[in-house]
């Protein structure tokens, strides 16, 4: 049996399962059976932007194609992202960032995985850069919003949902190169405002890195030895709207198309 290493996305999915916001059947399909889920339009745009910036294919190996008009021109949203590519190039040039590798696959951690968008030399330091695209660059309330105020409380679940990637990749870099707390940056680009982009440098408490390593160990044991062994009925967390759009919908025996009855006690 081939065991699954824990990526930061799988770690978040397991947490969502714990709080009943994600179906276990979908997690098994994506991370154990490696079934492909169709990307949303927002994900497609993000994949295209990252491909144009780094020249690295998405994990499905398919070259992203932009939306085009009948005359062959880019659609309006993609024209905004084309302008953002110019902003990205300006950032690289004006900050004197030397890109060493793109799409770097970390291998040396025995139980954790991750693929860095960019490994670079910045001010004579090896750094990790991750590219994000968002329609909510100044929104602190949206799950994928990047409003500055969101990070005033770094321990909040909403902030950690975004920053856990930095924690994971810093840990991976320690195993990979022996670098303690490697500098990590998010480059965030708006999909709605072609002139809006942000750079966040993420500083991580060393104690948190140690705790994260233990969390990876626990998640690895749980996923590989317990989670995937559960029955379909134990894994399923059906929810009407979620089931309706799930890529497993056609053959799933646990799906629902009417709401579950919930009891209110007064």
Predicted regions and their residues:
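Short intrinsically disordered terminal tails
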Residues: 1, 125, 265-266
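Metal-dependent nuclease catalytic cores that hydrolyze phosphodiester bonds in DNA/RNA
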Residues: 1-116, 120
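A short, sequence-level motif marking secondary-structure junctions
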Residues: 11, 19-21, 134-135, 204-210
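Metal-dependent nuclease catalytic regions and adjoining charged, substrate-binding loops involved
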Residues: 39, 75, 156-163, 168-266
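Hydrophobic/aromatic-lined pockets within catalytic cores
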Residues: 53-57, 133-136, 174-178, 224
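Secondary-structure boundary elements
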Residues: 93-95, 120-128, 173-182
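Non-catalytic protein-protein interaction segments used by genome-maintenance enzymes to assemble
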Residues: 101-163
